[in-house]
Amino acid sequence: MKFFVDTANLAQIKEAAELGILDGCTTNPSLMAKEGIVGQKNVWEHYKKICEIVDGDVSAEVIATDYKGMLDEGKKLAKLHKNIVVKVPMIREGVKAIKYFSDHGIKTNCTLIFSPGQAILAAKAGATYLSPFIGRLDDINSDGIELIHQIRHIYDNYQFKTQILAASVRNALHIVKCAEAGADVVTCPLNSIVGLFYHPLTDKGLAQFLADHEKANKK
């Protein structure tokens, strides 16, 4: 399973990359705004900075919602760096755009997936990735992890090549559950990845080892 970090914060991206387990990065307009990155020129320059840090795919989202606009914007984004993946919303015009990009060798991430039917459409159009939003489904008392199971089953049935990129992942347990469900990729904040390191028995065991070592060396 691949780990992507879901942020536009360069310091956090660097920290994630330094762990040695980072495979990519996802961003969206909200994350860019959170970092105070405004204006197309500044946003696109920021994408380039992210690509300099991350040795892997970087999702950059189109703002346009019409077919022509998405094509124009997506083509320009793809030219920024070889690792750019054009992120396209799950709407009718978006699926058409994904098909075009797929036919022309441009990687895509179909975002805002909330149902198995949407996942089928994304795969049929040739999306490189699709992003089911786990946490947002949980927020409305639906089952985000179950959606991953459903998509995995469908994709395995028909040998679809689209990678399941679990998004809206809120914590370390979500990551593990996504892995169990067969997600190809999990994208999440840095603190969720870091949360995987910790277990009270690991801390207790290490403390005991160090205490025993110190005691033995005092003799």
What name fits each language-model region?
Residues 3-5, 9-13, 19-21, 27-100, ...:
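Active-site beta->alpha loop and helix N-cap motifs at the rims of alpha/beta catalytic domains
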Residues 11-19, 69-73, 97, 115-125, ...:
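Catalytic cores of alpha/beta
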Residues 20-24, 80-84, 100-109, 124-131, ...:
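Glycine-enriched alpha-helix->loop->beta-strand junction motifs that scaffold or abut catalytic
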Residues 28, 86, 122, 151, ...:
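Conserved, mostly hydrophobic/aromatic
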Residues 29-33, 112, 128-140, 183-202:
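Glycine-rich phosphate-binding active-site loops on the catalytic face of alpha/beta enzymes
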Residues 44-58, 95-108, 144-164, 207-219:
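Alpha-helix-loop-beta-strand connector modules within alpha/beta enzyme cores
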Residues 111-165:
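A contiguous pocket-lining binding segment that forms or flanks enzyme active sites
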Residues 155-219:
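C-terminal alpha-helical cap/extension of soluble enzyme domains
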